[in-house]
Amino acid sequence: MPTASINNHEMYYEIHGSGAPAVCMGGWGTYCHGNEKALARGLTDQHKVLVYDYRGIGNSTDDPNTTASMRLYAEDLIQLLDYLNWTNVHLIGLVGMGCCIGQEVAINRPDLVRSMVNMGAWASCDQYLFDQLNLFRSVHRDSGFLTFQEFVCIYSFLPEFYNENKHRLLGPDGQWRELKDNYGTHERLVEACLTHDTMERLESIQAPTLIIHAAKDMVTGPRTTLPLEWGINGAEGVTMKDVAHVVAGKEQKIEFCNILFSFLAKH
C-alpha cells in the first residue's frame, strides 16, 4: 500500500474512485484500511478520493518530539497533495479535526482548494468545547480505551441509534478503534484540536464553502459551526435538524449525501 516520506514522517494514503479530486478527512480515526465504506455513498463514483492516516494512526508514523498542532497536520496534507501533483481539490472535513485541517489548507494554500465542506467543526475552542475535548482525553488516560469509547459514543449518537447499535459501536472493533493501545497519538491529536484557532483568519478563505450544522450535536453543534458560516465570505450554511455528532442511519446518510452532492455539483 502507498506511503510517502512527507514532512519528516511516513504517511500512508489510499486513493479510491475516479473523477475530480477530493480529500475526505474525519476526526480521530481514518477512512483507510477498509473504512472507505464509510465515505458518502456515491462519492467515489464521481470523484477520485484521497484518504490517509493521520500521524500515529494506522500505518503513518509520527515523531513525538514534534509539537502537535493543526498547522502540522495541515502541512502533512499540503505536502502530500504536492507529492501527488493534485490541485483544485474538494476538501471534505467531517466530525472533527479534518475540518480544522481543511481550514488551514484553504488559508495557507488556496491554490490547492476548489471547495471546502465542514461539518462538526470549529474555528477555535470556547471554554465548553475545550473542556469537553480535554475530558475525552483524560477519560482515555485515566480509565482506559473502552471507557473512553463508551463515553464518546454516548455523546456522539442519538439515543435511539445508540440503543439499537450499541453492540456494533463498542468494543475492540468499534468506534475510534484506531486509538486502542494508542493513547500517545490521541493525546497529540487532542492537543492540536485544543490549540486550533482560525477565527481571525476565516475571512481569508476564498474557496466556496459549505458549513453543515448538526442541530443535535452535543460536541460541535451550531454553537461552534455558525461562526464559520458567519466568518467565511460567501459561505453556505445548511442545518440537519435531527443529526447528532455523527451522521448515522440510512435516512440521515441519504439526507447528508443529497446536501453534499448538491454543493459539489455547483463547484
Predicted regions and their residues:
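Conserved alpha/beta-hydrolase catalytic His-Asp/Glu region
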Residues: 127-129, 147-196, 200-201
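Short beta-strand/loop motif that positions the catalytic acidic residue
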Residues: 205, 211-213
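Acidic catalytic loop of the alpha/beta-hydrolase fold
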Residues: 216-220
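Flexible "cap/lid" loop of the alpha/beta hydrolase fold
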Residues: 103-107, 114-143
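Catalytic histidine neighborhood in serine/cysteine hydrolases
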Residues: 225-246
